[in-house]
């Protein structure tokens, strides 16, 4: 049985947000990310956000759009609301000064703090009997989600249904990264990025006891197999991005330091409305041979439990 979507959306409905919000969104757990995207969907990004506007998100809409069961949608709505309510966006440097001018905050280039944390949600309420969640964005977050078009600020555009259906953190973050480049440079279907910067975009890192960043997957073949190839497979399966590929762009000695990503965005042939059957990666013969040998040498880790 198909669930009926009550929201005024379709498979080409877009959500938009300024690029400064990307890192925060990439860090959000899946339930919080889905709640955030559902709240962004009805916003007219060309216009200012109406003061006092409250957004209502129905579990049945989330289930239908994300292609998950109603029971899971109910759980994620409640869990995601709590997580999103505790989430913040952190700004540094010029981003603080720019926001200070927009919102009349008491900061200038001379007295700017090192970091500024902003709450995303002013309040959030869950009504379990009726199966919906209500929330209100803070005033400080409004410049990042409304009045975007026609201004010099760069923003990222994603398809709502595609962003909701990606279930892996790495898939979601890589999809957002590709859409950022596509949104800002529509005539370019590629971008070059360092491996370290890519891991930061994908949140593939932790911090040591001294607060220093430690990147995950130091061995590139494992990063390629367990992160990039799997993320690309899900993106091609569930989004409007019909092709994603990457090649080594630069090395430092024998170490791979930069990658070149190429992609094709085809919003007219959105693949997210296909049935969710098992899917396989389309690998070149060379990649397939490499991965076969590599898997025999370094078997993938099995899930515990």
From Swiss-Prot:
Record's keyword annotation contains Repeat: no
A Gene Ontology BP annotation from the UniProt entry: DNA replication initiation
Any one GO MF annotation of this record: DNA-directed DNA polymerase activity
Recorded superkingdom: Bacteria
Entry-linked InterPro entries: Initiator_Rep_WH1, WH-like_DNA-bd_sf, WH_DNA-bd_sf
Annotated effect of mutating residue 113 to S: In mutant COP50
Cystines in this chain: none
Gene3D superfamilies tied to this protein: Winged helix-like DNA-binding domain superfamily/Winged helix DNA-binding domain
Pfam families xref list: Rep3_C (PF21205), Rep3_N (PF01051)
Protein's UniProt keywords contain Calcium: no
Record keywords: DNA replication, Plasmid
Family statement drawn from the similarity comment of this UniProt entry: Belongs to the initiator RepB protein family.
Function, in words: Initiation for plasmid R6K DNA replication.
Miscellaneous information on this protein: The expression of PI protein is autoregulated. PI protein binds to direct repeated sequences within ori-gamma region for replication.
Subunit-structure text: Homodimer.
Protein name from the UniProt record: PI protein
Naturally occurring in which organism (per UniProt): Escherichia coli
């Amino acid at each position: 049985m198909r669930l009926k979507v009550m929201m005024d959306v379709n498979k080409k409905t877009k959500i938009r947000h300024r690029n400064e919000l990307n890192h925060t969104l990439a860090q959000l757990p899946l339930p919080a990310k889905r709640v955030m995207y559902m709240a962004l969907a009805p916003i007219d990004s060309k216009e200012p956000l109406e003061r006092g506007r409250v957004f209502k998100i129905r579990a049945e809409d989330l289930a239908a759009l994300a292609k998950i069961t109603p029971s899971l949608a109910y759980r994620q709505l409640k869990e995601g609301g709590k997580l999103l309510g505790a989430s913040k966006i952190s700004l540094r440097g010029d981003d603080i000064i720019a926001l200070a001018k927009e919102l009349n905050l008491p900061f200038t280039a001379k007295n700017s703090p090192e970091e500024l944390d902003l709450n995303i949600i002013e309040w959030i309420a869950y009504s379990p009997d009726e199966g919906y969640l209500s929330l209100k964005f803070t005033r400080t977050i409004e410049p990042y989600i409304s009045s975007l078009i026609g201004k010099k600020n760069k923003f990222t555009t994603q398809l709502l249904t595609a962003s909701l259906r990606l279930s892996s953190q790495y898939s979601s973050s890589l999809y957002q990264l590709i859409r950022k480049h596509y949104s800002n440079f529509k005539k370019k279907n590629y971008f070059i990025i360092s491996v370290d910067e890519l891991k930061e975009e994908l949140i593939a890192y932790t911090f040591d006891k001294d607060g220093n960043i430690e990147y995950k997957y130091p061995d590139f073949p494992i990063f390629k197999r367990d992160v990039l190839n799997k993320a690309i497979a899900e993106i091609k399966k569930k989004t409007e991005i019909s092709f994603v590929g990457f090649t080594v762009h630069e090395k430092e000695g024998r170490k791979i330091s930069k990658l070149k990503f190429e992609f094709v965005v085809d919003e007219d042939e959105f693949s997210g409305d296909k049935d969710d059957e098992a899917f396989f990666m389309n690998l070149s013969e060379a990649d397939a041979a490499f991965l076969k040998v590599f898997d025999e040498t370094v078997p993938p880790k099995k899930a515990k439990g």
